[in-house]
C-alpha cells in the first residue's frame, strides 16, 4: 500500500529506522505501535476518525517508547486504546407538532486512571461512535495535561438543536438525561458542553438530573450558570487558554504577538474569546466564520458585534456586514486560509485544515498555528506544518483551558464556594503555562525539539500510563 504524505512525514520527523541490505526495517517500538494500530483497524474498520486520532498519538510516542520499554511490558497501548465503557441508548422525544422522534445517545467512558471521566456532550447530526471515541481518546490526554485529577470521556447524540424551539430542546435534553443519569455522578463521570450544548442545554440537563436524583449535586455537570454552581471564566476559558499557550510558544522564540495579523475560524465560544484575548494582547484579528461563510474585516473584527449576533440573536455571521459595510462576507469558508497572516487559529471543527489549506497558509506567511477546535488539522496538514517549521500548538494542549476551568468548577462545587473571575483566570494562565513548558521540555528530552504534538502526547501519556501501571491490570 502506498504511504500517505502523513506516514512519510512521521517516518521523517519522529521515527528511527535502520537499513539492512538496502531495506528499511522498523525498530521494536515502531513495530509495537503498528501492531496496536492494526488491532484498531481489525476491530473497528469503519471508525476512521478514531483510527486517525490513535495514529496521531501513538506514532508520536515512539521516541519515548524507545527509552521507556516498561510501557510495552505492561501492554499500556493495548489497554489505553480500548474505552473502559461505551454506553449507547435511545432518546425518544416529542416535537411541538406532537410528532415523535427517536435519536441515539452515547457516552464513551474512556479512562478513569487519574480521576472521574470528564468530557463534553455534543449534539449534532454528524455524531457517531467513531467521532465520540476519537474525542474521548483525545480527552484522556488533554485532561491529563492540566495536572488536575480528571479522566477522559465524551458523549452526545445525533440530535441537532439548530432550528428547534426551546421547548423541543428541553424535551430532548430531559429524555437524554433520564438515561444518562444512571451512568454519571460527581465522582464517576462529569459531562460538560460541546458543539450544540451550551448554557441552555446544560440548564435543561441539570434540571432533569436534579429532579430524578432529588439532590442538588452541582458537581455532576460543568458549564452551569453562575447562579447554580457555575464558574466565572468558564465561557472564556478555551479561547483565553488558547492565546495563553500561543503567546508562550511565541515568547519562547522571542516573537512578540503585538501587531501580528491573525485569522480565526468559527464564531462560537472558542473563537469569540480567542478573538477577544488576541486583541487584548495587541494582535489584529481579521476573520471569523460560521457554517454559512466567513467575514473579512481589514480594520479588525469587532468582537462585540460578533457576540451580539451569535450569543444574543443566535444569527448568522453574514449579518456582521449590516453594521460594518467596509467588511467583506464570503460564502466559501475555505478561502479564508488564503488571507495573509502570521497566526492562524482554527476554532470551528475537526478536519477544517487539510493538506491543500496547509500549503496555502504556509505560502501566505503563517508562522504559528493554534488549534482551538478539536483536531481541526488533518494528519497530512500537521505533518506539513512540522516539515516547514511552523510553530504548531496541537488541540489537546492548546485548547485544554476549557476542561481545566471545568475541573476548577468541580473544585468550587466541592468547596461550595465561588471564586472570583480574576482567581480563575490567573489559575488558568498558570495551568496553560505548565502545559506549554512540560510539552516543550519533553519534546526536547526525547529528541523532537519544538514538536509540541509529540511533546504534549508524551507528557500526557506518561502521566496516565504510570498510574495505570501502579493500579494494576484493571
Task: Annotate each language-model stretch with its function.
Residues 230-338:
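Glycine-rich phosphate/diphosphate-binding loop of Rossmann-like nucleotide-binding domains
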Residues 70-101:
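Structured beta-strand/loop patches that form or line metal/cofactor-binding pockets in enzymes
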Residues 3-25:
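Short, Lys/Arg-enriched N-terminal segments with co-localized hydrophobic residues
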Residues 27-53, 249, 362-474:
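Adenosine-phosphate binding glycine-rich loop
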Residues 48-51, 67-74, 147, 184-193, ...:
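Flexible, glycine/charged-enriched surface loops at secondary-structure junctions
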Residues 293-392, 397:
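Rossmann-like adenosine-cofactor binding region
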Amino acid at each position: 500500500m502506498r504511504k500517505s504524505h502523513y506516514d512519510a512525514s512521521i517516518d521523517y520527523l519522529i521515527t528511527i529506522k535502520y537499513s539492512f541490505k538496502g531495506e528499511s526495517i522498523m525498530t521494536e517500538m515502531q513495530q509495537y505501535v503498528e501492531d496496536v494500530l492494526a488491532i484498531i483497524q481489525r476491530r473497528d474498520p469503519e471508525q476512521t476518525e478514531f483510527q486517525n486520532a490513535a495514529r496521531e498519538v501513538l506514532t508520536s510516542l515512539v521516541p519515548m517508547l524507545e527509552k521507556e520499554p516498561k510501557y510495552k511490558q505492561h501492554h499500556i497501548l493495548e489497554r489505553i486504546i480500548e474505552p473502559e465503557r461505551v454506553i449507547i441508548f435511545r432518546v425518544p422525544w416529542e416535537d411541538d407538532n406532537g410528532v415523535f422522534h427517536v435519536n441515539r445517545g452515547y457516552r464513551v467512558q474512556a479512562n478513569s486512571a487519574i480521576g472521574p471521566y470528564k468530557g463534553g456532550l455534543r449534539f449534532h447530526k454528524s455524531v457517531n461512535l467513531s467521532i465520540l471515541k476519537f474525542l474521548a481518546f483525545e480527552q484522556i490526554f488533554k485532561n491529563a495535561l492540566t495536572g488536575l485529577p480528571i479522566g477522559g470521556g465524551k458523549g452526545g447524540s445525533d440530535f441537532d438543536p439548530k432550528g428547534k424551539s426551546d421547548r423541543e430542546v428541553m424535551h430532548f435534553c430531559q429524555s437524554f438525561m433520564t438515561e444518562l443519569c444512571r451512568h454519571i455522578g460527581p465522582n464517576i463521570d462529569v459531562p460538560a458542553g460541546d458543539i450544540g450544548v451550551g448554557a441552555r442545554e446544560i440548564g435543561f440537563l441539570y434540571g432533569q438530573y436534579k429532579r430524578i436524583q432529588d439532590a442538588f449535586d452541582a458537581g455532576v455537570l460543568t458549564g452551569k450558570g453562575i447562579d447554580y454552581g457555575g464558574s466565572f471564566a468558564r465561557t472564556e476559558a478555551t479561547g483565553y487558554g488558547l492565546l495563553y499557550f500561543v503567546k508562550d510558544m511565541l515568547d519562547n522564540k522571542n516573537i512578540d504577538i503585538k501587531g501580528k495579523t491573525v485569522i480565526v475560524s468559527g464564531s462560537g465560544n472558542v473563537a469569540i474569546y480567542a478573538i477577544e484575548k488576541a486583541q487584548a494582547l495587541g494582535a489584529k484579528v481579521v476573520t471569523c466564520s460560521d457554517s454559512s461563510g466567513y467575514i473579512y474585516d481589514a480594520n479588525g473584527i469587532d468582537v462585540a458585534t460578533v457576540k451580539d449576533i451569535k450569543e444574543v440573536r443566535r444569527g448568522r455571521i453574514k449579518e456582521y456586514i449590516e453594521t460594518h459595510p467596509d467588511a467583506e462576507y464570503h460564502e466559501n469558508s475555505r478561502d479564508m486560509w488564503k488571507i495573509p497572516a502570521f497566526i492562524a487559529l482554527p476554532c470551528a471543527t475537526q478536519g477544517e485544515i487539510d493538506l491543500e489549506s496547509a500549503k496555502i497558509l504556509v505560502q501566505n506567511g503563517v508562522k504559528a498555528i493554534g488549534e482551538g477546535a478539536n483536531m481541526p488539522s488533518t494528519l497530512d496538514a500537521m505533518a506539513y506544518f512540522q516539515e516547514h517549521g511552523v510553530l504548531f500548538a496541537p488541540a489537546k494542549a492548546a485548547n485544554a483551558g476549557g476542561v481545566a476551568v471545568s475541573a476548577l468548577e468541580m473544585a468550587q462545587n466541592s468547596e461550595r464556594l465561588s471564586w472570583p473571575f480574576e482567581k480563575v483566570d490567573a489559575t488558568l494562565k498558570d495551568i496553560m503555562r505548565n502545559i506549554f513548558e512540560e510539552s516543550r521540555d519533553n519534546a526536547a528530552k526525547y529528541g523532537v525539539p519544538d514538536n509540541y504534538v509529540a511533546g504534549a502526547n508524551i507528557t500526557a501519556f506518561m502521566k496516565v500510563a504510570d498510574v495505570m501501571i501502579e493500579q494494576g491490570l484493571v
